[in-house]
Curated annotation (Swiss-Prot):
Function, in words: Catalyzes the facilitated diffusion of 2-acyl-glycero-3-phosphoethanolamine (2-acyl-GPE) into the cell.
Entry annotated with the keyword Transport: yes
Designated name of the protein: Lysophospholipid transporter LplT
UniProt similarity note: Belongs to the major facilitator superfamily. LplT (TC 2.A.1.42) family.
Chief location of this protein within or outside the cell: membrane
Membrane-spanning intervals of the chain: 19-39, 53-73, 91-111, 139-159, 164-184, 195-213, 227-247, 257-277, 281-301, 304-324, 352-372, 373-393
GO cellular component: plasma membrane
CDD domains per the UniProt record, alphabetical: MFS_MefA_like
Subcellular location: Cell inner membrane
Organism of provenance: Salmonella typhimurium (strain LT2 / SGSC1412 / ATCC 700720)
Amino acid sequence: MSESVRTNTSIWSKGMLSVIVAQFLSAFGDNALLFATLALLKAQFYPDWSQPVLQMVFVGAYILFAPFVGQIADSFAKGRVMMVANGLKLAGAAGICLGINPFVGYTLVGIGAAAYSPAKYGILGELTTGDKLVKANGLMEASTIAAILLGSVAGGVLADWHVIAALVACALAYAGAVAANLFIPKLVAARPGQSWRLSAMTRSFFSACVVLWRNGETRFSLVGTGLFWGAGVTLRFLLVLWVPVALGITDNATPTYLNAMVAVGIVVGAGAAAKLVTLETVSRCMPAGILIGVVVAIFSLQHALLPAYALLLLIGMLGGFFVVPLNALLQERGKKSVGAGNAIAVQNLGENSAMLLMLGLYSLAVLVGVPAVAIGIGFGVLFALAIAALWIWQRRQASY
């Protein structure tokens, strides 16, 4: 690794900008592909409950590969790991375009995403340090949410025009991400020379889980981010079901517009968190987490587009302010104890286990016929109570 790469820790360095561009294109593809594939399922007359199952196979890949992807991220240059992972996403999207079963293709994309995540967040701690890491996380989240905004809308709008065209656009986005990864500096592997025996890797991963869980700060971060992303992915699918019921709109584009409002809000909230919250004042984000659940419950009762847009914007702002400091806290503390790649892999296991549980409960509620509005209200109330309980628990732990 060159000396310039070692010393340039600016969040506007060439390496950081390359990471952000690659992340934008990869996240654009992820979000466009979700809505394009949902449109494909609708066009092929799959039942409503199968929609969250699509995300569950994606999440299942994260959980299955969780013991291995952190070590992969720490054993090789993270930029190259990101490139290979985006190549897997490209293969999955291209496969769906060519007619393979959408659940199979989406699973392949999930495997790529599982390998990609520890590398994309772990590399931030190698390109910058300290409180700049909070700002770098804010920049990463802003880039991601901008991609969610544009990707979700593009996926829905293109799918209303032509489903295959939407799928091709996703494949092209992944191809662009692969190209952008080539411009990321080749950093020295964080932890080379580890054992590649599956039993040793599994033991190492679960040892990292134990280390992070026993630390009060990282445990707090793991639970908070798990609850947030589990709720976030469930809200996405709830919107697809809620829009026709509450608003009487049946196209593919409207749920993507509503999801985009959440994305805009998260950009604002992430920026506010970068300015107002440090690693020493992370608990400032907790009231925002409680308010997310309250606003979701209020949102579920709406029957007009304008207040729905406004409330989803507010949900996004609260979400960005809540999750960015928790991510930065885990990366900083995890880098020092188990390595950034392993820390993010453990975080992914927690987040995706929460997603799988929440999506499973949501699918069950849809299958047994619970109305969409009732699901939304119950979901919001339970989320607010869960974050309040986490905050109380964290304060008690800190007082010991």
